[in-house]
Regions:
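A solvent-exposed, acidic/Ser-Thr-rich amphipathic alpha-helical stretch
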Residues: 30-80
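Short, low-complexity N-terminal intrinsically disordered segments enriched in polar/charged residues
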Residues: 1-30, 131-135
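Hydrophobic pocket/interface hotspot
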Residues: 9-12, 23-28, 32, 50, ...
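A beta-strand edge to alpha-helix "cap/lid" segment located at domain peripheries
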Residues: 1-4, 59-135
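Short, mixed-charge, low-aromatic patches
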Residues: 10-19, 42-45, 62-66, 86-88
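Gly/Ser/Thr-rich helix-start
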Residues: 20, 51, 98
Length: 135
């Protein structure tokens, strides 16, 4: 029996939460195309292609910039080959000490049980203010 796309995405968030990056990466297609939201601090290398590029360009930088970074997606919406996740990012900026608490939405595209594309939508101004990248 195959898992539903919602289950796959729910498991991805669970793997991220527990730090199981091997399980996270296993859910991604080898040539996944990952895009951070325009004007987000880590969008400078868009698109990220492949799990290693995502780990180094997004997750390692996030861990470097934030203490206690967490992604809490409260709603998962089934759109067939797409799953939309709605929730929040939280953490504390290591540079400023300011708390991060911003809305986020993710659009995941799946094919054959693997994530082939990811698009982040987020409060980029709130993030920039937390990091003191904007006034």
């Amino acid at each position: 029996m195959t898992r539903s796309n919602i289950e796959i995405i729910r498991n991805i968030y669970g793997a991220f939460e527990t730090g199981d990056m091997a399980a996270f990466s296993a859910a991604l297609a080898p040539d996944i195309v990952w895009n951070e939201a325009e004007n987000y601090p880590y969008a400078d290398r868009n698109p990220y292609v492949g799990a290693q590029a995502i780990m180094e360009g997004v997750f390692a930088r996030t861990a470097q910039d934030f203490d206690g970074f967490a992604v809490s997606m409260t709603d998962l919406i089934d759109g067939g080959d797409r799953v939309v996740a709605l929730g929040r990012y939280t953490g504390t900026s290591r540079t400023t000490g300011a708390p991060l608490d911003v809305q986020a939405a993710h659009v995941w595209t799946l094919a054959d049980g693997k994530v082939v594309q990811f698009q982040q939508h987020i409060d980029t101004l709130g993030t920039a203010r937390t990091m003191r990248l904007a006034g």
